[in-house]
């Protein structure tokens, strides 16, 4: 069983060029379509072991040739103007086949006119192409103000004396089914592009047609890939190290928080429970073993009473050396008071010695001026160290007056 189906494909830029030429013209436009027709047979085997062959024809519209003057290659009756037709298609190569023609009409319906049908039949006979297609494009105003127009297009193909519409697909970059490799021939290349490529071909291509710089570019690409792999490995290692450091930092923060919380709890406990004077407790047990009242007394190191009695043993090794007498330097407050007293006494003693040295000098001067025979004058000036300055001066005056008195 065999079947046939036909579809048409037109690239987006070809369709855009067609519409641009039409919308920038003040009247109807027409021209020819160039491209190729490819047939592909698909054989599918069914469960009944019968071959089902389907032939798919694809019309690839690759280029258009506009006629800048309406009805240039035909007359009113639809007869062809052969010389003008040859001029229009003279610049086209043999590889570029004429697969159809097109026409734009303003403010009309999507229906082929009788003259278009006759013209299409004459073109089929002249071009010897029974599969010639006709692309009809019409534009109609979509609003009452005619500010927006609606463009309609349809591809017509004659079959058994009737024109049937062929599905036309406008390929676009956004279409997912157009991302693969094309099995059809490429678009028609312009003459200017061919001339430019031939002129500069030797600069970029070898004699065998391969690019001259492909090997260098491939080597550079390989080197870049190696460098990229090294950089990626270094990046992975650095990310791992950063992750480990972050984990260590978080662990340290957690430990610090736990330690801080523990210190706060222990600090509160210490502040709530003052430290006991263990030595005093053991001394009371040693010297008053029969007194329950003294053994139940608990004092802190600061001298404050602890409400709860002590029943535990403190396990002090030097229990025999304990005594109830406390040395003065063992008490910090007493040691501070004693140091203050010693400092004040040293200052007072210094002032006293200075005054005594001055008084001794005065006494020496008076003793030199007076009579040295008397026993009282030979007596040195001695102080016990407890006399005041007034007592010393009084004794000095008494000695001086005694030395000046006459002796009988």
UniProtKB/Swiss-Prot annotation:
What GO terms in the biological process aspect are recorded for it?
Answer: chromatin organization; double-strand break repair; mitotic G2 DNA damage checkpoint signaling; positive regulation of DNA repair; response to ionizing radiation
Q: According to the UniProt entry, where does the motif pSXXF motif sit in this chain?
A: 405-408
- InterPro entries on file: BRISC_Abraxas1, FAM175, MPN
Q: Where in the cell is it found?
A: Nucleus
Q: Where is the composition biased (Polar residues)?
A: 360-372
Gene Ontology terms, MF aspect:
polyubiquitin modification-dependent protein binding
One of the record's GO cellular component terms: BRCA1-A complex
Q: Keyword annotations for this protein? A: Chromatin regulator, Coiled coil, DNA damage, DNA repair, Nucleus, Phosphoprotein
UniProt entry tagged with the keyword Iron: no
> What kind of modification does the protein receive after translation?
Phosphorylation of Ser-405 of the pSXXF motif by ATM or ATR constitutes a specific recognition motif for the BRCT domain of BRCA1.
Residue ranges annotated as coiled coil are 210-273
Q: Which residues carry this modification: Phosphoserine?
A: 405
Q: Give the start-end ranges of region Disordered.
A: 360-408
Q: Is-annotated flag, keyword Manganese? A: no
In which domain of life is the source organism classified? Answer: Eukaryota
Relate the protein's function as given in its record. Involved in DNA damage response and double-strand break (DSB) repair. Component of the BRCA1-A complex, acting as a central scaffold protein that assembles the various components of the complex and mediates the recruitment of brca1. The BRCA1-A complex specifically recognizes 'Lys-63'-linked ubiquitinated histones H2A and H2AX at DNA lesion sites, leading to target the brca1-bard1 heterodimer to sites of DNA damage at DSBs. This complex also possesses deubiquitinase activity that specifically removes 'Lys-63'-linked ubiquitin on histones H2A and H2AX.
**Record-stated family:** Belongs to the FAM175 family. Abraxas subfamily.
Q: What's the name of the protein? A: BRCA1-A complex subunit Abraxas 1
The organism is Xenopus tropicalis
| Gene that specifies this protein | abraxas1
């Amino acid at each position: 069983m065999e079947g046939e189906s036909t579809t048409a494909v037109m690239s987006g830029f070809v369709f855009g060029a067609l519409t641009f030429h039409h919308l920038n013209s003040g009247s109807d436009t027409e021209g020819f379509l160039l491209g190729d027709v490819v047939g592909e047979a698909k054989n599918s085997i069914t469960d009944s072991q019968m071959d089902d062959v389907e032939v798919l024809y694809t019309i690839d519209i690759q280029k258009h040739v506009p006629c800048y003057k309406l009805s240039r290659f035909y007359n009113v009756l639809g007869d062809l103007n052969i010389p003008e037709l040859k001029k229009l298609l003279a610049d086209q190569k043999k590889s570029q086949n004429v697969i159809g023609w097109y026409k734009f009409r303003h403010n009309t319906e999507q229906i082929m006119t009788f003259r278009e049908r006759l013209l299409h039949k004459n073109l089929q006979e002249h071009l010897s192409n029974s599969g010639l297609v006709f692309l009809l494009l019409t534009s109609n105003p979509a609003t009452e103000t005619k500010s927006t127009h609606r463009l309609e297009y349809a591809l017509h193909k004659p079959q058994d004396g009737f024109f049937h519409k062929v599905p036309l697909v406008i390929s676009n970059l956004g279409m997912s089914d157009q991302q693969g490799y094309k099995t059809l021939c490429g678009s028609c290349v312009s003459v200017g592009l061919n001339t430019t490529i031939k002129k500069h071909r030797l600069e970029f291509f070898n004699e065998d047609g391969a690019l001259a710089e492909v090997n260098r570019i491939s080597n550079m690409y390989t080197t870049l890939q190696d460098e990229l792999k090294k950089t990626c490995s270094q990046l992975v290692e650095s990310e791992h190290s950063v992750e480990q450091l972050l984990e260590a930092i978080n662990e340290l923060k957690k430990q610090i928080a736990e330690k801080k919380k523990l210190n706060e709890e222990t600090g509160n406990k210490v502040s709530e429970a003052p430290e006991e004077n263990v030595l005093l407790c053991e001394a009371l047990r040693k010297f008053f073993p029969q007194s329950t009242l003294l053994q139940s007394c608990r004092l802190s190191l600061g001298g404050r009473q602890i409400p709860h009695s002590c029943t535990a043993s403190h396990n002090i090794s030097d229990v025999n050396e304990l005594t109830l007498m406390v040395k003065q330097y063992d008490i910090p407050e007493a040691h501070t008071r004693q140091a203050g007293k010693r400092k004040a006494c040293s200052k007072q003693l210094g002032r006293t010695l200075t005054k005594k040295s001055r008084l001794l000098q005065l006494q020496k001067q008076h003793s030199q001026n007076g009579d040295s025979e008397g026993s009282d004058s030979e007596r040195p000036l001695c102080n016990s160290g407890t006399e005041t300055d007034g007592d010393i001066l009084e004794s000095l005056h008494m000695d001086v007056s005694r030395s000046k008195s006459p002796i009988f």
